[in-house]
Amino acid sequence: MALDWDFMFHSIPAFFKGLELTLYISFFGILLSLLVGFLCAIVLYFKTRFISPIVYIYGEIARNTPLLIQLFFLYYGLNEIGLSALECAILALGFLGGGYMSQSFLLGFKSLASIQRESALSLGFSPLKMMYYIVLPQSLSVSMPSIGANVIFLLKETSVVGAIALTDIMFVAKDFIGIYYKTTESLLMLSLTYLIALLPLSVLFVILERSFKKKVA
């Protein structure tokens, strides 16, 4: 079966419009997940009393429930709050990602030898200064591959936000399939659009990983 190249060409603006929304949700959702994950990792790393169990439970819930359910819970279950679909998508992505990012950061923190932490504390470093000057710079070289994988995973997870009527690239593809019955062309354009977004990210994280390793070496 021959591809309808004319249809694919004329669908480019719609897919790029959907990509714009996908990247917007991904940017703020991933930013939120990095912040939440980092703070949770610090709590787990220092084994903060009372708070650590709560953070642990949050992480288990975030990682073991699908993003779609989290979206529905925010958009339909808590509709009295009045959050928009876009806000729900960003918050749900941040909630899901925070659970994964916390483990990525924690992996890096735990990679440091205990003697480094003990030496820093004996030299009068506060836990905050120790984290900033010693733990964070060295741990990022270990955490970066996992963080990069999580970022790519979260961007791909945005494919479900169309369930709450957000016109991301997956929504655009489904719309074209339903209206024009161009299944192969629509899915091919969808795949190409994701590749345009994800391949530069993959390269970026490889560069960042090498950069952090050189700084630590």
Please tell me what each predicted stretch does.
Residues 1-217:
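Transmembrane alpha-helices and adjacent helix-loop boundaries
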